[in-house]
Regions:
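C-terminal substrate-recognition "lid" of short-chain dehydrogenase/reductases
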Residues: 74-98, 103
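Catalytic loop of short-chain dehydrogenase/reductase
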Residues: 1-19, 24-33, 45
Length: 107
């Protein structure tokens, strides 16, 4: 999310994420003749060990901020997308946001 929704004070972090996004298509094209594909998944707000250290009210507010579905992402959500990427060979050189349509505020 920070590659496209950069936040105040996080310019270097956003730039690093933007670098990954910028490499996605060239990294798909270069080895394509060998049948190698490249995709980037840009996850939104997921339930992670770091997030679970936050107070419950913060976790609830983050989950509620996701337009649909209004919840935190799960490992199963991520795994379903990975499975689709693996099984659909037409997916190549793309960045897929897995974020429930959330966009971060500047702060």
């Amino acid at each position: 999310m920070d590659a496209s929704d950069g936040r105040i004070g996080l310019a270097a972090y956003s730039a690093s994420k933007g670098g990954v996004v910028g490499m996605t298509l060239p990294l798909a094209r270069d080895p394509a003749r060998n049948g190698i594909r490249n995709m980037t998944i840009a996850p939104g707000i997921f339930g992670t060990p770091m997030l679970f250290t936050m107070p419950q009210e913060v976790q609830d507010a983050l989950a509620a901020s996701v337009p649909f579905p209004s919840r935190l992402g799960t490992p199963a959500d991520y795994a379903k997308l990975v499975h689709q990427i693996i099984t659909n060979e037409m997916l190549n050189g793309e960045v897929i946001r897995l974020d429930g349509a959330i966009r971060l505020a500047p702060k």
